[in-house]
């Protein structure tokens, strides 16, 4: 339904009066935000009901997407935009002398995710809604999300991200649809008259209460639902409380509700590991119960479940959904084991996000057995049958069977549960999918090659272009029309204008304005001053050794030393922009943050260098900050060691906004370079086969350090340090083990950075490269990814 300005104005004024008892002229920005969000949510809710009615009427297959995190960011701007209400809302507010951007700023980022995994899941809800694929996401309603990051004297400090007070307005609770989840105790199996019975004893219950958010599709009637489970105690222990045992009464409630407090609690200790397993089973079990209940309400049988339901496991965190469905089919619905497993096999598919076998998730068998006793029994039987099936496929090869088995070395291997059960196993880039087949799951590829697929990641490109970069959007409309708004492949039409001087000049003007806007925002928000005429070189992603932010830092240190020794050298000013959180228990990542921040402070305080070089560390980097940065970016640092990054999606957002990729041929960088042309990116570093060969021979970082004067000087400089501080933890790691081969790629990275400077000085060439990237970014749309999943994995079709 479309709303006229008068209709929408009445909606907003009525809502302000009913909810806040204020007129629009007297309302605060927060009151306007909340009421505007309520209106938007209600419109999406109504549309979702209509959409779901069509889904059921047409008997469509429904897709359920299980993921530990959904990095939603802010909802108001994109929801209004996708609903076609952004302009009318802006006009209504303008009449009241209110800027809509002020209202957008009232909304906190939803604290439901951490990095690329969660942002991908959020983009796919948008893609499913836009494509008309009936989709529901499932996760946990984290009270505090990941954490708020503060940088104090170079050190990351974590504080609670209390996002719900401002974000609750998007969520509606449905306690009438709650599920009971059981942990601990014993599961007693008995047989009576040929029937199998399971009795639970001494278990602890937690109630999973569903809370729903909605994601509207663009130019579509589709609306995706995100169902988030909140943990509650089954009831308050009044008898303990009345007896004066207050701590006992409160602790039982607190223990249950701990499950939905925080995303990824520190698991460097046993208690943290148990809590993570409880989180995974809690949301997986609640989701499976919800899916099966909905299906039974519609069809009255589970016999046709595989025809009407597709469940995608995004990474291994929701793997326990598989044995949980087996449990329900066996224990509650009396299916034979073979029939139950056949249903699970047809329903479940698994997306892998790992390139290293040693990084695949495993659970200590004792923790698993004690926490999930019935699921442990089912997993043991799955392991027995898995071994029997593998023995037929690989007779006599016990080593291979043991490696592929579900249980081994006193561990439950969740990835092997997925590989054995799921009808489809997909990687998230062409290179990654080949690595899966060649190494990570090579034996399973030999066992069931037909199950292995590729679906390259995609992004909700309208959020990152139409909403975040209106200047570029307007230029594209003027140059190629507005077809790209609904069909990202239409961006390809820009390719014939990449050498058009008028278009180049217009694109450069847009980029300069975006850089100035970001510089102004940064100064207002943090007090930091950056030069909008410097090169904006950006690396924003999770802080991790494999992402190699320390490689970037080594080059900056090298440039600093070069400028100190050559003050009159030609050097295009550069602003290096970092944004990253380190996992709370990841010491080396925190040391890398400290090194980058201290290096930035050193440069800032050196008048001989600070006009040419600058480091900005964006504290508490999040989706809404990313939406400001991407349009201003010029260089996209994607510098992981070849063969370690599954795909990435930040690289796609940078590309879409015209940044040049400076990167290795890793993950989706390969497809970015293939699409835009390798000559339009700046590629460096070893290829995956070279990395594997070097590992095979035995990698010794000193062999690369000792022959490189710059490398030796930089490491010595960081070890010596300044102002009483040094960075021996990082440099010692690089000299002695260097697990991600930073020093092996350092020299070529320096060459790539030099090439970047030369290319940037040639404005015509740089603008050509930038426009080439924009014009070839359409293939990385989430719309395309979702249709690939629907066709190749889910067997789902759009609602007409």
Protein language model regions, located:
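A conserved ligand/cofactor-binding region detector
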Residues: 1-800
